[in-house]
Amino acid sequence: GGQGGPVAAPAPPDARHAPVLLRECLGAFAGRELGVFADCTLGLGGHSGAVLAEHPEVRTFVGVDKDPRALEIARGRLSAGGAAGLRAPPAAMNFVRGDFRELPEHLRGAGLPGEGAADGILMDLGFSSLQVDDPERGFSFLRDGPLDMRMDPAQALSARVAVNEWGEEELGRVLRDLGEERHWRRLAGRIVQFRAARGSIETTGELVEALGAKGWKPYHARRGRGPGGGRRAGPALHPATRTFQALRIAVNGELQSVESALPAAIDALAPGGRLGVISFHSLEDRLVKWAFRRAAGQARAAPLSKQEKFSGVRASVTGPELGGTDAARVRILTKRPLTAAPEEVEENPRSRSAKLRVVEKL
């Protein structure tokens, strides 16, 4: 876990740091006996703090994150007297710097069996507001900073490498398939022209400029008139949104991570244990839905979408997973994903695209 000196008490969580779908997550574990609880994507500990407050019976907690700073903040928040308000935190608190794909290994590190040990597991596939709000990490098109986007700062591939070294065709495919960007061809061309003219693209601000999105305002900020002069709200989506999403997914191999993390998390569940997964875009939600269906014995593998064919997801899967139906290992508790109530969306716009799916181990 993250080592280091004492941490300043974290500021009270504002809307940006508010855990999404918190009520729905608590509902997923309500009335369950959680002896062992694991949060695969700990972030600042918002979800876990609330779960632990409602479940004083938790004996062993395992919180996993790649980001050492997030771990340090979460450790402070979840300690006795910390911001989460836990009077008596679980006896065994484990903070692990690691990858959520390796949950069984992290459980073994906490002295538990790697499989069949966890009564509750939570996975939030969104990226932490700590990363988005730090311009140095290069995740946000709203704050100028180095073009980076690596969840794991130690890896070689960054957004800067992708934007400057990938060919126009490859960039276009990434924007189309991972960003679901309609104007992929035009935007890939702009990136390549801009870097040829400037020598390279080094910052998030330069990338926004390359995309022709510098100084963009939604229509409602332009005296409330839409493109035809009519009074209607304009598109709320910044034109760089999908490009930044695509690069983030590509740089971090996010779809492949989710693809291998879900079966590992299901393995880690004890009988009757529950796994809740929050996703933020349709590609991820689709992967979660089909992984759960396969584990519930309801479906053969999903037909490969363009995105999955392109990203190499499931390309390596052979044998029973693509052949027949797996024997049922879980029961799906969410026929449709749970989404944020209008009040939450108003308070925290990030929650608008969040979806929660839950399964229970048989």
What are these regions (language model features)?
Residues 1-362:
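S-adenosyl-L-methionine-dependent methyltransferase catalytic core, i.e., the SAM/SAH-binding region
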